[in-house]
């Protein structure tokens, strides 16, 4: 699966 890791520190 190609799940983009979105960091919550953005």
Curated annotation (Swiss-Prot):
It comes from the Bacteria. This is 30 kDa non-secretory protein 1. It comes from Mycobacterium tuberculosis (strain ATCC 25618 / H37Rv).
């Amino acid at each position: 699966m190609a799940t983009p890791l979105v960091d919550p520190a953005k």
